[in-house]
Each structure stands twice: as C-alpha cells, then as structure tokens.
C-alpha cells in the first residue's frame, strides 16, 4: 500500500504516531465558519446537498489516542449547524470505523464504506428530491460558535432558537 509505505511505515515503526492525537480537537475551530461559507453558497444556489460524515478507522483512533468522545461531540455540532438551517440530507457513517473493510487506512473509505455511500447516493441522485428550504444564520460565522466547547452545545441550542 503506497499510503502506508510513503506516509506511515517509518513513523509507526519508530512509535512517533503513538498517542500523538491525544489532545487534538475538531470541536473548536475557525473551519466551522469556512464550512458556513460553503453552506451559504449552497443555499444561495438552492442546491440540494447530501452530506456524508465519514468515520475514522477505529484502530488508528485507538493507536493515536484520538478521543471517541470528541468525535461524537464534533458529530453533534456539525449536525446542529446543518439541520438548524435546513440541510437535512446527512449520511452519518461516523460509527462505522470498527466495521471490517469499511476503511482502507486511517480516514479513507474501503470497499464496504463505498458500498454504504453508494447505497445512499444512488437514490439521492436517481429519485426526485423535494426542493430544499434553507434558513441561513450568520451566527455560525461567529467566534463564539467556532470556539464553542461541546459541553455548552445544548445551552447554545436553547438560547439560539
């Protein structure tokens, strides 16, 4: 596997990647505002979008000590950003990282993963979909949202209805 030999083999053998993602968090990032920019463009063009949330390979996650709790919290935060604005076509595969052959490496889908995606993409593309109705909210550009700790998501949802 080219990815393994060129990118991971040496690092794995020396142990440099062991626990290296222990303090990594996807939940607090300016990229939530970047994502909002994409969503605004989809809404402006009235584009019906199917979002796919892929898993992380569970063995990789364990080896690098990437927090399962943090990944679930990221999942909740991105779902809220999407669904609160009317983006309801979401294929959430984030719980499939432990399924054999679902992933080919750390973050890339394997044949089972692509089969799962195809089973959702095919009907989305081949069947008539209802016209989307988006209600965009500029609060997702705010630093408050970008840096919102997952522990405050429920409170944020209540105060920003």
What are these regions (language model features)?
Residues 27-33, 38-104:
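Extended hydrophobic/aromatic segments used for targeting, binding, or gating
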Residues 76-161:
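C-terminal regions of proteins
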């Amino acid at each position: 596997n080219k990815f393994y030999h060129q990118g991971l083999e040496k690092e794995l053998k020396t142990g440099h990647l062991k626990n290296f993602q222990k303090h990594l968090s996807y939940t607090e990032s300016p990229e939530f505002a970047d994502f909002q920019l994409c969503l605004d463009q989809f809404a402006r063009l009235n584009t019906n979008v199917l979002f796919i949330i892929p898993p992380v390979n569970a063995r990789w996650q364990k080896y690098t000590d990437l927090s399962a709790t943090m990944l679930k919290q990221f999942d909740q935060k991105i779902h809220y950003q999407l669904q609160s604005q009317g983006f309801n076509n979401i294929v959430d595969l984030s719980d499939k990282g432990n399924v054999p052959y679902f992933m080919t490496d750390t973050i890339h889908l394997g044949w089972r993963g692509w089969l799962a995606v195809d089973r959702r993409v095919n009907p989305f593309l081949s069947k008539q979909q209802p016209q989307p109705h988006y209600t965009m909210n500029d609060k997702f550009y705010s630093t408050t949202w970008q840096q919102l700790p997952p522990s405050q998501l429920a409170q944020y949802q209540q105060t920003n209805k």
